[in-house]
């Protein structure tokens, strides 16, 4: 299956696809502007970077069957009760939508923070779903927590799967059940969410996020390698880029911005069964 990656970061979606049972996945390109993330991505993958999504001419993109990406949560200027494609102008989701409108891939998989569901009293999420509906996509979604996918991190994200009407409908959600590997019983070993501002924290507890763990003799911060593990990446995934070593500050940021790889793997495995 050919896919296009947007807001690609360090390649969490791509690694999840690699680990899934997809037959001969091929990335036709990715879009990323953070220079450190690009360095890491290019060290791990040999894909073309189309750069700033706002400057991509969608008509020049190769054809693909699946669009993937985690876009920022932004407010829309909604003129009426039902937001649509035109109401998303000025946001990065608009650029996702215009690529979908131009290329009409069979499937899309989008990720965002759980707060998207309640942002602006739910108006933001309604506009996103209405826009996808306007573009011909039926959608399903679910909030998934990384702790239920074999990593000890309490990280909730909403995932949206859209399928083009007239094509086979993948029944992806709900995901979960009694047979789900769950790390809730690890107690004190469960980390709170790693976010992009982790490196700015001190040895305190802020905003409900536990940034410290108990060592053998003292309390300490997580290391970048441990943050990689909590997101399901191999050790030292972010340690080096194409131009050499990456600072710990940037490694914390990139891990915090990434998706959790095992979650993507599970979703992709559900997608490709249809």
Q: Which residues are covered by each model-predicted region?
A:
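Core alpha/beta nucleotide-donor-binding catalytic domains of modification enzymes
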Residues: 1-107, 114-126, 133
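Class I SAM-dependent DNA methyltransferase catalytic core
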Residues: 20, 135-137, 141-274
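Short glycine/proline-rich turn/loop motifs
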Residues: 75-77, 109, 243-249
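Short coil/turn segments at secondary-structure junctions
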Residues: 80-83, 112, 250-251, 255
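Short beta-strands and strand-loop turn motifs
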Residues: 107-113, 142, 245
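Short histidine/acidic/glycine/proline-rich micro-motifs that form metal-
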Residues: 113-118, 146-150
């Amino acid at each position: 299956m050919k896919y296009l990656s947007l807001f690609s970061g360090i390649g969490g979606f791509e690694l999840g696809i690699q680990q899934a049972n997809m037959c001969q996945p091929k990335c036709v390109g990715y879009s990323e502007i953070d220079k450190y993330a690009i360095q890491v991505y290019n060290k791990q993958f040999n894909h073309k970077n189309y750069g700033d999504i706002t400057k991509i001419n969608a008509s020049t993109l190769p054809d693909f069957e699946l669009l993937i990406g985690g876009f920022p949560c932004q407010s829309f200027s909604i003129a009426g009760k039902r937001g649509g494609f035109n109401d998303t102008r000025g946001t990065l989701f608009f650029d996702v939508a215009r690529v979908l409108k131009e290329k009409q891939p069979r499937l899309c998989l989008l990720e965002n923070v759980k707060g998207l569901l309640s942002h602006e009293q739910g108006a933001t999420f309604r506009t996103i779903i209405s826009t996808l509906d306007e573009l011909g996509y039926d959608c399903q979604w679910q909030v998934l927590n990384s702790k239920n996918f074999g990593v000890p991190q309490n990280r909730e994200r909403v995932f949206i799967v859209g399928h083009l009407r007239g094509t086979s409908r993948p029944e992806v959600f709900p995901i979960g059940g009694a047979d789900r590997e769950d790390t809730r019983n690890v107690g004190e070993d469960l980390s709170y969410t790693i976010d992009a501002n982790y490196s700015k924290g001190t040895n305190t507890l802020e905003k409900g996020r536990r940034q410290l763990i108990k060592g053998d003799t003292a309390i300490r911060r997580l290391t970048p390698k441990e943050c990689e593990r909590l997101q399901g990446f191999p050790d030292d995934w972010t340690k080096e880029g194409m131009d050499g070593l990456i600072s710990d500050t940037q490694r914390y940021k990139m891990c915090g911005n990434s998706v959790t790889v095992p979650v993507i793997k599970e979703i992709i495995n559900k997608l490709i069964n249809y």
